[in-house]
From Swiss-Prot:
UniProt-annotated glycosylation sites, renumbered to this chain: N111, N117, N183, N198, N210, N279, N317, N362, N387, N405, N422, N449, N480
GO cellular component term of the entry, any: azurophil granule
GO biological process: glycosaminoglycan catabolic process; heparan sulfate proteoglycan catabolic process; keratan sulfate proteoglycan catabolic process
Record's protein name: N-acetylglucosamine-6-sulfatase
Gene: GNS
Disorder cited: Mucopolysaccharidosis 3D: A form of mucopolysaccharidosis type 3, an autosomal recessive lysosomal storage disease due to impaired degradation of heparan sulfate. MPS3 is characterized by severe central nervous system degeneration, but only mild somatic disease. Onset of clinical features usually occurs between 2 and 6 years; severe neurologic degeneration occurs in most patients between 6 and 10 years of age, and death occurs typically during the second or third decade of life.
Role according to the record: Hydrolyzes 6-sulfate groups in N-acetyl-d-glucosaminide units of heparin sulfate and keratan sulfate.
Length: 552
């Protein structure tokens, strides 16, 4: 499959697309923000970067198990992060955090709808020009390639349709709206192309693999490149390639300690799940778990093809490859059937594997990292001055290169704005308005007042999670993950009140942070007095719109 010509205004292969005839002095001036650690000395090629992003792939429940080739080709050849988190356990806010390097309260994407700023005109106007790919393209001279799922509302007619190509992308091969495997439409540099249900030409994961390999043949050899490949797997509808549809027949969702138990002393939304689950519900989630793994086998093939092609072209040793997911997932934990959105480790913790120049093989890092760090890291690799950005994240490059005596964060923020229906669900008349994502047995995965903010703390002394809900209770959940890794026991009422106050203080500071102030929660003020009702401005409004004032 051949790529269509570049999007309007992009130059073709065969000459550098940035200042093809400028003097060396002028080139240094234009790329001055990207000199960094690599420089632009004669004969020096700045590294290439590939970012592989899956959809809903967990880390806690064994989501990396099917990807044997990926673990061998990326993880074993580089570094695996064992404590990688997302700032929101939902596709669009998390992907926006990757692109901008910002927490949701700073990029203002709060859910998967246009009203929640997902690929809205406001997002396009305010955030897209400042994403790290836009900086790579405009300031660092990288050719940039995107293939796959962008944001859940991308292609919506009210936000420019498929003709809209975000700033910063030289090659654009994006899926309309949410993940599918067949019968979808792609925007190819702003032109729509429909795909059907013929496996050999339409299976999306394979299409992304083919067009990515094509880019490596088609690209300019005068510029470094950045590739972002965002697969549909393992997102529903969990359609595996034909050759993998019988794989993992003896695999079941993990029966860990928090599987199919009541969410005692948790937020009401978790407590409402019916325990024990019915046999039919367990069969359904076991089947979903199995199919998710099946879809990932095609991702494993994609990774292998990509690495082999980079090796064949002689570019592998000068290329950083990142592999991660936009959020985790659950299958029966606390009797919640299947979804993400919740504050627990299974939903907010993701795989993160990196290989590249200067990274020793078979490394594991326990440092607390988040997907807001990906943009700063990639810009740092390109040599861009991070002080010129307003990103909340930190560059992982010192960790990747084995820096010693490194000063690093101890806290990351997780925040989520719940969604609910305005009317009673006709299939569940016993439920009041305000819930959503409900299953036939009326177990719901979300609600308006499932709005929460958490601080996840990892240090030499603590391995804690502290969360507050924006509801009438101002409900608090606290977990000691050293003693209770499955987060079964909420210790909010038994923990030392002084420590509780410190965690609340850190959370308040992170929720009001921006840029550099997000990288540390600051020094605890001994005069601070704990009052959880200060966390949210509307003090328990059930149908909260805490972020809406920022949408322009």
């Amino acid at each position: 499959m051949r790529l269509l010509p570049l999007a309007p205004g992009r130059l073709r292969r065969g000459s550098p697309r940035h200042l093809p005839s400028c003097s060396p002095a002028l080139l240094l001036l234009v790329l001055g923000g990207c000199l960094g650690v690599f420089g632009v000395a004669a004969g020096t090629r700045r590294p290439n970067v590939v970012l592989l992003l899956t959809d809903d792939q967990d880390e806690v429940l064994g989501g990396m198990t099917p990807l044997k080739k990926t673990k061998a080709l990326i993880g074993e050849m580089g570094m695996t992060f064992s404590s990688a988190y997302v700032p929101s356990a939902l596709c669009c806010p998390s992907r926006a955090s990757i692109l901008t390097g910002k927490y949701p309260h700073n990029h203002h994407v709060v859910n998967n709808t246009l009203e929640g700023n997902c690929s809205s005109k406001s997002w396009q106007k305010i955030q897209e020009p400042n994403t790290f790919p836009a900086i790579l393209r405009s300031m660092c001279g990288y050719q940039t390639f995107f293939a796959g799922k962008y944001l859940n509302e991308y292609g919506a007619p009210d936000a420019g349709g498929l003709e809209h190509v975000p700033l910063g992308w030289s090659y654009w091969y994006a899926l309309e709206k949410n993940s599918k495997y067949y019968n979808y439409t792609l925007s190819i540099n702003g032109k729509a192309r429909k795909h059907g249900e013929n496996y050999s030409v339409d299976y999306l994961t394979d299409v992304l693999a083919n067009v990515s390999l094509d880019f490596l043949d088609y690209k300019s050899n005068f510029e470094p490149f950045f590739m972002m490949i965002a697969t549909p797997a393992p997102h529903s509808p969990w359609t595996a390639a034909p050759q993998y549809q019988k794989a993992f027949q003896n695999v079941f969702a993990p029966r860990n300690k928090n599987f199919n138990i009541h969410g005692t002393n948790k937020h009401w939304l978790i407590r409402q799940a019916k325990t024990p689950m019915t046999n039919s519900s367990i069969q359904f989630l076991d089947n979903a778990f199995r199919k998710r793994w099946q879809t990932l086998l095609s991702v494993d093939d994609l990774v292998e093809k990509l690495v082999k092609r980079l090796e064949f072209t002689g570019e592998l040793n000068n290329t950083y490859i990142f592999y991660t997911s936009d959020n985790g997932y659950h299958t029966g934990q606390f009797s919640l059937p299947i979804d993400k959105r919740q504050l627990y480790e299974f939903d907010i913790k993701v795989p993160l594997l990196v290989r590249g120049p200067g990274i020793k093989p078979n490394q594991t890092s326990k440092m607390l990292v988040a997907n807001i760090d990906l943009g700063p890291t990639i810009l740092d690799i390109a040599g861009y001055d991070l002080n010129k950005t307003q990103m909340d994240g930190m560059s992982l490059l010192p960790i990747l290169r084995g820096a010693s005596n490194l000063t690093w964060r101890s806290d990351v923020l997780v925040e989520y704005q719940g969604e609910g229906r305005n009317v009673t669900d006709p299939t569940c008349p016993s439920l009041s308005p305000g819930v959503s994502q409900c299953f036939p047995d009326c177990v719901c995965e979300d609600a308006y007042n499932n709005t929460y903010a958490c601080v996840r703390t990892m240090s030499a002394l603590w391995n804690l999670q502290y969360c507050e809900f924006d509801d009438q209770e101002v409900f608090v959940e606290v977990y000691n993950l050293t003693a209770d890794p499955d987060q079964i026991t909420n210790i909010a009422k038994t923990i030392d009140p002084e420590l509780l106050g410190k965690m609340n203080y850190r959370l308040m500071m992170l929720q009001s942070c921006s840029g550099p102030t997000c990288r540390t929660p600051g020094v605890f003020d001994p005069g601070y007095r704990f009052d959880p009702r200060l966390m949210f401005s509307n003090r328990g409004s059930v149908r909260t719109r805490r972020f809406s004032k920022h949408l322009l």
